[in-house]
Structures are given as structure tokens and as C-alpha cells.
Amino acid sequence: MTDRRNFLKSALLASALPLGATTVTRKSDRKVIATDVLVVGGGCAGSAAALAASRAGAKTLMVEKAPFAGGIVTSVGLPYFDGIAHITTKRVVVRGIALELLAKSGACAPDAQKIVSHNPTIPNTFEFKLLLDRLFKEQQGRLDVLFNSFVCDTTTSDGRITEVTLANKDGLVTVKPRVVIDCSGDADVAAWAGAPFEQNSEVQPLTLHFRIGNVERTPDITKLCREALKLAQSAGELPYYYGPGVMFLFAKNEVYIHGIRVPANPTDAADLSRAEMQGRSDAHAMFRAWKQHVPAFNDAYFIEAYPWIGVRESRRIIGRHVLSEDDLMQGRRFDDAVATGCWYLDLHPNKTTTGGANDFDPRKVQPEPYDIPYRSLLPQKLSNLLVAGRCHSATRGAHASTRVTVTAMAMGEAAGVAAALAIDTKVAPSDLNGQKVREALAKVGG
């Protein structure tokens, strides 16, 4: 009887498999990839870093957890090139790859000295994905890209990162890099490899961006939208919000909105998951409130919320130099300056129910263009790691300015050039002369 039962059980299991299917045991052997430069993250900083390193001749691998590059522009949907130009004169202060991307998106001339807005927008975030894809493909043979790939572990020896472990459709993959550039936004590689960092117990709120179609353009739309959200909040349908920014950016009857405010810890998986769900809930609550109370939305429909909620702040490495508010506001100059910033100190309050988008008075915290030194991209304790983007070394106040789109691109380009220079000269990034990095950037227009 037992044998018959086992036979029937096996037969039933076999019948559940498609014709010709076989059971496969996963191989224990990992795929191993050796590369000169590993760029972790394909957002604004990471895309610029990967392009800069590969264009400078280094064999480069960029890994990104999304199925496309562009980070806050494409995954979060923020189309602004914040930090590219002086707020009053509109003079372009960041050139290099950032200006190249803006020009190739059709927003300005490639040799622009001044632009119409200090924070111009690109016309189409999907086409920005295509632009990055095309630029990556132009570096074929020098640049490999792995999308849908998560960094999940690091191995260090004698102050060097020797291996980085990825998880993707190949299983667990071991990467053996000579230089690593952490552009993860959250300093994941730096933190897991043991580099010192800091993270405030309460960070800036997370924001989901979304779009609504078939909206009538009326002069009082922003005022009415704000009044409707007050009613929704009073009814318990919307916990926090700011603004909101209701902007006709992409089409004459379509609005793009950022006004959601979700307090959360973006380096805690469970809390980040909660924030993603809360953001979607809040976006639809806003839409319902406007449909109910604002005539311009009578025939409107919800187009989409972008895939990821936007993160403003998480870990910041403690580097060889910690860039401070005073450095920015005093316009302090550095011999090893490798990037320029010009955005105001933009610190969003975490838990206020309504109100403005900044804990600072922007009139009092608008610096002139300022230097970002190479040392603020260098973490302590690890010789072959560079960090670029919003997780670089800065105080919380300075980071409120340096975290934005174009400043991240400028840091990423500098890190990519530095990584290639380190490979070429056989010198660890930690031992590179920052002035040499600056000279190398000048040669490529960065």
C-alpha cells in the first residue's frame, strides 16, 4: 500500500509539470565578474559616474536595482535639474555630463552659458531613460550595465573592498572590483563595508510624485487644491502634506504633483515598505479630495504614481572632509574642489501637517556657487571606495543643498574620473591628489 501511495504521489507531481519539463537543482557555483570600477546605483550620481569612468578608459560595471537608470528623474519622476544654474543670474554653474544630459533632453543648447530657469525641467522622463540607455551603449566594450540587481553584501580585507555580492536573476553574483563608487543614495556599500557614517533619527520626509489627467487649467486651481486638502486632513483622510505643487508640466490638461509627506526611515526595509504604501494611499486621497471639491478636476482621472517614493535623506558618510553649512554660506574655496553646488539649503520638515516645504528660510540660506572638495567623496577606513550623491560627507544642513539632482551628477562625474585616474596611475583613490582629479575633470569639461 505504501509503495502504491508513493507511486501515485509521484505520478500526480509529474502530471503537474508541463510536458518536457524537468526539475533543476540550482548550481552552487556563483558567477564571478572582475572589473576595474564598480558603480553601485544608476541614478543621477551613478549614471554620471559610470559614463565618466568608462569614457576615461576604465572597464566599468554599473549595477542598478531598477530596470532602468535615472534615479530620482525616472523612478521618482522629478523632472527638475536643480542646482545647474545660479538662482538670480541663471548662469550655468555646473557643466560636464549634467549639462550634456540637459542639452540632449532638448532643454538648452549644449554650450549654454545662461538658461531661462535656474532649475529647468526635462520634457519627458521616459525619453530620459532612452537617452541614458543610448549613452551607455556608446561605451560598449568599456561599460557593462546590470539592471534589476541589488547589492547585498561586501567583503573587505586590509582596508579594501575585495568583493561585492549582488542578487539578480543569475542568483548571487560576486563582483571583484579594483575601485568601488557608492552611488546608492543610502551609502549601502560604505555602511556594510564598515565606513563610518551618520544618520539622524528623524530624517526629511519621503515624497511620492504622481500625475492626473484631463484637468482644466484655472487661475485659482492651486488655492482650491490647498483648501480641499485641508478638508481631507480634517476628515482624517490625509495625515501629512505640504504645498502642494500642482504644475502643468507635461501637457496642457495634465498636472504633476509633489505634495505628499511621509515620515519614515528609508534604510529600514519594513518602514520603507510602509512608506511606499502610505504614499500611494495619500496620492489617491488627494485625487479624491480634488475630484470632490475642485471643479477643475470634475472629469479628471488618475494617470500614475511613479514607481518609487522619493528619499531625500538617509545615511551620510563621515569622510576625509565633512562639508558644512559654513563652507557653503561663506563660499569657502578648496584646492581639491571637484564639483560645484548652488542650491539653497532645502530641508523639508518631517511631520508638519501642512505648510511650506522648508525648515529654513530660503532667503537666508541661498549660497553663492560653492566648492565640493574631493575629500568629501572619500570615506574613512576604506582605500578603494568613493561615495557620490546624497550620501557623501556633509553635515545635515549642507546636505540639504548638495543632495539635489545636478549636484549629485557633478559629484558622480568627479568620482568616475577619479576612479579611472586611480586605475591608470595604480594609486588608491584615498591616496590620489585631489588637485590631479580636478585637472583631469577640466580636460573633459567637467
Where do the model's predicted regions map?
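Conserved N-terminal/central alpha/beta ligand/cofactor-binding core
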Residues: 58-59, 64-153, 207
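Aromatic pocket-lining residues of Rossmann-like dinucleotide-binding sites
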Residues: 53
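N-terminal secretory signal peptides and thylakoid transit peptides that target proteins
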Residues: 1-15
